[in-house]
Amino acid sequence: GASHIPMIIVPPKNSNYKRNEIKAYLAEINDVYPTILAMANIEKPENITGKNLLELDEERIFYGNSLNKHFCIIKDNIKLIYCSRGDVKLLFDLNEDKMEQHNLINDKNYKHIEEELWKLLIEHTKKYTPELLENDYFITSEPPKNFKDIQNRWFGFHFRDYNVDTFH
């Protein structure tokens, strides 16, 4: 899931990083480790997926993965969600629909964006969790029939309403 909260990072006083800046971009928990390493002048290991937040100066592409079953990508404030349980896609324009109530996956005006985001999501998954793919597509499974099918787990967006995103 995600948290919509501010993140405050204070670099060391004697560093070359700018201070007292406000940046409005998406950050992941994975970004904390490489940011701390950079502030300590330690090179980031190659297998680390996060970014040094003190060096980001452009809008980033955000990738989300929950339980290796639910995935999302956000680019230019367009959010694509994919659930491998049931093989379902959702697409939202966060500029127009901040509450993610209107699924645009079948809107012809967004088809090219959906295809671009899907390609990026597959490439990202191929790089970091290739075991989730088969023939360049996510390995799918049947959606749960009811809440008893999922023990001690998040119900996902198949629980009651297929049209509502709960990847928050």
Spell out what each predicted region is.
Residues P12-S15, L94-E100:
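Short acidic (Asp/Glu) and glycine-rich catalytic loops that position anionic groups and cofactors
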Residues G50, K69-H70:
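Short, acidic/polar N-cap/turn motifs at the starts of alpha helices
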Residues L104-H168:
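Long, internal low-complexity/basic segments
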